Amino acid sequence: MGDSKTPLPPGAERYESFSFNVRLLTVMGVVGMVLLAVLGRTFYLQILQSSNFEERARLQQQRTVRLEPRRGKILDRNGRILAVSVPVGSLYTNPSQLKQRKRVAQRLAPILKIRSRKLVAHLKSKAPFLWIKRQLTPQEVQQIQKLEIDGLKFLPEFRRDYPAGELAGALLGFTGVDSQGLGGLEYGYNRWLHGEEVAYVVEKEGMFRTRPEIRDERWEFNQHTLHLTLDSTLQHIAESALRKGVKRVQGKSGVAIVLHAPTGQILAMANYPDFDPNRYRRYDAAQQVNAAITHGYEPGSTFKVITVASALNEGIITPTQEFFCEEGRFQVADRVIRDSRPHGNLEVGQVIQKSSNICAAKIGMEMKPAQFHDYITKFGFGAKTRAGLPGEAAGQVLPPEKWTRVDHATVTFGQGILASPLQVVAAINAIANEGEWRPPYVVEYAEDESGGRHTEFFNESGEVLARFGPKAPRRIIDTAIARILTRFMVSVTERGGTAAKVAIPGYKIAGKTGTSQKYDPSLGRYSNSKFWASFVGFAPAFQPVFTALVVVEEPPRPNHYGSKAAAPIFREIMQRALLLMDVAPETPPTVVVTRPATPEMTVDPATFEAIGMQDLD
């Protein structure tokens, strides 16, 4: 048979060759398609999606920490720094980097003044970025650096510093650890003091090993420095006198305010007990507030100036008209009104000088409730002064349609009305300004980072967001009437007045004492043992430079009178203020009195305008 091969059918070789070529082309096609897909994917990833992957890689390698910027300064009228942001270091870590956390905590604890056990628990966090303590002192930073502990890092931040400590603390307010204003001017003007936040980038390598930090350079953008009307020296004088005076009479608290009489600028605003914003956590909330604007009190006899001014301006009474003071006891409906001392007949000026409740009630009741209420509101009571101080209270004035006869009588001597100390001093400042009420204010202007001065800020719609500096005054009473009231108030500080000891050699002081009982909600009546003692006035009386008010809360008997608790503080502040500003001694005008023919005679205000400042004693 042999081994001869079976011959292939015709065309078989050509078929086998074709089949091989098809398979080869198929494989090559598949390989080509795969290569094309790979190349396409590579092009897509490396070219079209490169920025996206770079961003992902960056996010994996970096952590962005949002830090607060440097706040604008707060300066007094002479450019002295009251608040400033200083650079500090803040300690952070990635806990996974730390070895021997317990040992690290033990070494850090005494420096940071944190219990070691608490620090160990804190370092157990699994967060890749962990604050250990922020806003360290330079000494703390230096001590920690000397420890040379791997994994501990610092980021630069700013801490708010108040170089003068307690000076104007309640007025300035304070900021939190994130540089946000939490009280006082810091809170009220946070929008302008606070710049834009800073993006601070921390790069990571491997297991969050940090590379050198990358700093964003927007540290001082868009914040403003506030320039105040406050005078640091006068503020210190007011705080010192208030602290000493309240302690002397063993009072609970006190407030002192000094205005620049012609403009309404707030030169000093003191609170006792005082408050250091550098250590705000050590104080309770009651000590952090500015009682000069937030606390309402019954102004007592200081309000008699408003009563007499209103009646005189209406022409209902005359300056020398006499009123019978009922020998110290006057029945109004179911209420008995008393004077501290019995009086017979008193002229209007003597009602102020001797501070008669009974005659003040009789004068006030000569006016209709709506008529009197209108003057009360014109003098600024029942509404915020809009001095630019956050947290200001509007006070409380009962609507005239709700007045009873007792309400009508008692409001004349400052009972049944709530007012802030700032409202009272602003009202009396209207007398100093010959009948014009001038809005008090504390911010003169805001300065931007390029040195531009701003007295107004607007939103995108053109609405005013803030307005600084002086505002337009409004006339309340005629000039002649205001001058008469000034003379009446001068008699208070002269022989025979309730505050003769306030007199300062070389100057005429226009003033008024105030003593009011505190309402006790638990008793449902006025307390017989708790009082507000106050004194308000301006000097020099006939060319006023300063208007000031002192209020002392709860001075115990027998020092509960305004003449004993508040007047001595006022005298010390005013005397030192006159010396500080080098105010020349005043020579009072020579005046002549022409008495009316009858007590009922009314005097045209134009008459007093013509005769100027008259001595009506």
Residue ranges and their predicted role:
Residues 1-280, 291, 296, 368-382, ...:
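Periplasmic/cell-envelope proteins involved in peptidoglycan metabolism and beta-lactam response
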Residues 2-14, 83, 204-217, 230, ...:
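Beta-lactam-recognizing serine transpeptidase/beta-lactamase-like catalytic domain environment
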